[in-house]
Regions:
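Short, acidic/polar
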Residues: 1, 41-57, 98-108
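Acidic (Asp/Glu)-rich catalytic clusters
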Residues: 18-30, 50-59, 79-84, 106-111, ...
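A short, structured active-site edge motif that brings together acidic residues
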Residues: 29-41, 62-68
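Active-site groove signature of glycoside hydrolases
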Residues: 53-74
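Beta/alpha (TIM)-barrel catalytic core signal, keyed to glycine-rich beta->alpha loops juxtaposed to Asp/Glu
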Residues: 68-171
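Conserved, mostly hydrophobic/aromatic
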Residues: 5, 18, 33, 52, ...
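A structural motif
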Residues: 2, 58-61, 88, 113
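N-terminal binding-site loop/beta-alpha segment at the start of enzyme catalytic domains
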Residues: 1-31
Length: 171
């Protein structure tokens, strides 16, 4: 099963619920916790990330991602320092739509990130053009968001019979 939980201060109570759940179940060490920084300015970024750590009930966050490129230069400096200090394990950057991928690729090309998160699905494949090959070449791990287009890909095949080869995969 999956052990990565990707959250954000933007997702309402998600960080608090995640922190409470992992603490109650005693599963923090089994989870890979990712969250995001999505604010302007160094001080606000530091405060937002500290609040995320408190809500997630962890002294060390596995991955903090600069969300949607917001003030990425400022936050990258802070995240590098945090990584050196051992309060985070990995640094990432995100953009949630196709139209942000050119800028995302330029940033990844000029800077070292451990992770990049972007949109990619069978009907949204722009990442194949530049971003995915660049991430591969730089050794940057890729997190895909919206792989099923918020369920629209499932709705498109609802009621359809599976092809015979699907049985090979226990579908």
């Amino acid at each position: 099963g999956g052990s990565m939980i990707d959250s954000s201060p933007m997702y309402g109570t998600a960080e608090a619920v995640t922190g409470d759940m992992l603490a109650e179940l005693g599963m923090r060490d089994k989870a890979f916790i990712a969250t995001k920084v999505w604010t302007e300015g160094r001080r606000d970024g530091i405060e937002q990330m500290a609040k995320s750590a408190r809500l997630l009930r962890t002294a060390k966050i596995d991955l903090i991602q600069i969300h949607n490129l917001v003030d990425w230069r400022t936050h990258l400096k802070t995240l590098r320092r945090m990584k050196e200090e051992g309060t985070i394990r990995y640094i990432g950057i995100t953009h949630y739509t196709d139209w942000g991928q050119a800028e995302l690729a330029a940033i990844i090309g000029a800077n070292q990130f451990d992770f990049v998160q972007t949109e990619y699905a069978i009907d949204t494949r722009k990442a194949e053009e530049r971003l995915l090959p660049l991430a591969r070449d730089k050794g940057t791990a890729v997190i895909i968001n919206r792989p099923f287009q918020r369920g629209s890909l499932f709705r498109a095949v609802r009621g359809q019979k599976l092809p015979p080869w699907a049985a090979d995969f226990q579908c």
